């Protein structure tokens, strides 16, 4: 009995990858691997397998990104002008960032022994440059009037800054002098795209810049104000103005808006 249990335990401890994971790891393209991950994730043996599957997505998408980046670098060195597939490069960067965050999520969960033993901590450094590429990718899409694509790339870049995946990235490396400018543009695009929650997030960052503070505040007030269809909407907007004014009592724009609302509400 004991011997049989030991055999079963040994079999479990040294079991190979599940068929679901093997199928993912055999995939040679990101599209095929992603489809298999979505199809087979629930059939994988444990969280470690899920992390391994998402890491395979990181590898495939980073190859797509790095292949095009290498052409750019060689063009600079050799003074050639070999074609670069920027669409493939940008999509590779985006997919790598998304997959790395999913990999991290499963990689940080306790194993069967209750211990956290991450295997893919290097993904943070690995995808950092890909993350930064999304700033240029979003701006390129913006100049081509592709708002949806611009926000896809910028939102991924912006929202991932607070991801625990990047907790160990040095502060000096995280410094991004263009952040407030992109946040301002992102706020405006998000408002136009009716994504008000994301617009407010961008506004809060853009308002940290003297250059964009006034314009970002105007966008924020427009978003907070909304349509003011009901009395409750107006009261909510007034309370939002009060909260902002309490933090910036010298701001005449906020004071003017408050006085205007008080007058309209006969308060």
Please name every model-derived segment.
Residues 14-17, 129-136, 175-185, 210-220, ...:
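Generic helix N-cap/helix-start motif at coil->alpha-helix transitions
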Residues 14-69:
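Start-of-domain marker
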Residues 20, 40, 50, 57, ...:
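Structural register within alpha-helical repeat arrays
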Residues 24, 61, 141, 183, ...:
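Residue at a conserved register position within TPR or TPR-like alpha-solenoid repeats
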Residues 27, 57, 64, 144, ...:
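Structural motif corresponding to the intra-repeat A-B loop/turn of tetratricopeptide repeats
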Residues 38, 98-101, 155, 204, ...:
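Alpha-solenoid helical repeat scaffolds
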Residues 45-48, 108, 162, 211-212, ...:
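Short coil turns that delineate tetratricopeptide repeat
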Residues 62-148, 152, 156-180, 197, ...:
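Short coil/linker segments at helix-helix boundaries
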């Amino acid at each position: 009995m004991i011997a049989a249990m030991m055999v079963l335990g040994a079999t479990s401890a040294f079991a190979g990858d599940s068929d679901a994971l093997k199928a993912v790891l055999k995939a040679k393209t990101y599209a095929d691997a992603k489809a298999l991950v979505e199809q087979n994730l629930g059939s994988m043996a444990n969280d470690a397998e899920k992390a391994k599957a998402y890491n395979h997505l990181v590898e495939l998408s980073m190859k797509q990104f790095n292949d095009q980046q290498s052409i750019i670098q060689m063009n600079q060195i050799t003074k050639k002008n070999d074609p670069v597939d920027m669409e493939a490069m940008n999509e590779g960067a985006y997919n790598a960032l998304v997959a790395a965050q999913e990999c991290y999520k499963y990689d940080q969960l306790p194993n069967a022994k209750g211990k956290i033993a991450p295997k893919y901590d290097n993904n943070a450094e690995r995808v950092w440059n890909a993350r930064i590429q999304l700033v240029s990718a979003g701006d390129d899409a913006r100049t081509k009037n592709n708002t949806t694509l611009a926000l896809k790339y910028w939102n991924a870049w912006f929202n991932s800054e607070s991801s625990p995946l990047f907790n160990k990235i040095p502060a000096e490396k995280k410094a991004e002098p263009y952040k407030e400018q992109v946040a301002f543009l992102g706020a405006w695009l998000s408002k136009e795209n009716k994504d008000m929650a994301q617009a407010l997030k961008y506004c809060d960052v853009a308002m940290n810049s003297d250059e964009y503070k006034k314009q970002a505040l105007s966008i924020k007030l427009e978003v907070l104000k909304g349509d003011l269809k009901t009395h409750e909407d107006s009261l909510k907007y007034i309370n939002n103005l009060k909260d902002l004014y309490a933090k910036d009592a010298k701001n005449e724009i906020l004071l003017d808006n408050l006085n205007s609302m008080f007058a309209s509400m006969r308060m």
